[in-house]
Design a protein with these regions (language model features):
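Extracellular and organelle-lumenal recognition/adhesion modules and their flexible linkers in secreted
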Residues: 1-186
Length: 186
């Protein structure tokens, strides 16, 4: 349901070469392909009115985000996301042209995070500022820890977004985030 949940989409695959235009890459086999900062084909980006961002699918408000390429979740991950929240700062994932939720249905979210100082985060699924479901967590500890929560939608929505907000501000390192419906079969 989340796009770029491991924050690696804008990291060029090994052996690929970024062209000067910032859009195309040369693959290891010599083919020229579109990369668009990890968004994929430019026609998909333009056709779906995807706003530009340095880390695909992730947007901030009163916060700074940057890729962390050394302090990752484990040796199988190429990146983590370092967040510096100001007071009332937020981080939003747009999903694949929105996140679809159904009233009364539950969704399992888990994330790996760590923080030098304890930080409170509010996790919500919302549409145009209206919270459809949410929960809170406290992140602490200098090792990645898994945090799990259930989110149950209050109403149907096909264009929701996941937002992680921080009332007090602070820094957190996110290693991976997953959001999946509990009911995956008809």
């Amino acid at each position: 349901m989340l796009r770029n949940r491991s924050f690696e989409d804008s990291v060029l695959p090994e052996g690929y070469i970024q062209r000067e235009d910032g859009i195309h890459v040369k693959t290891v086999s010599g083919w020229l392909d579109e990369f668009c900062n990890g968004e994929g084909l430019c026609r998909w980006v333009k056709g779906n009115n995807i706003p530009e961002t340095e880390i695909p699918a992730w947007y901030t408000h009163n916060a700074k985000m940057e890729l962390e390429l050394t302090d990752t979740l484990n040796e199988h991950r190429d990146a983590a996301l370092r967040m510096q929240f100001e007071k009332d700062g937020s981080l939003t994932n747009t999903g694949y042209c929105g996140i679809s939720v159904k009233a009364g249905e539950s969704y399992s979210l888990y994330l790996f995070a760590k923080a030098k100082e304890e930080i409170g985060l509010d996790v919500t699924i919302q549409y145009q500022g209206k919270v459809l479901t949410g929960n809170s967590l406290l992140v602490s500890g200098q090792e990645y820890t898994r945090y799990d929560m259930k989110l149950t939608a209050a109403e149907d929505c096909h264009e929701a977004q996941l937002t992680i907000s921080c009332k007090e501000g602070g820094e957190v390192l996110l290693g991976f985030i997953s959001l999946m419906p509990d009911n995956t079969y008809m």
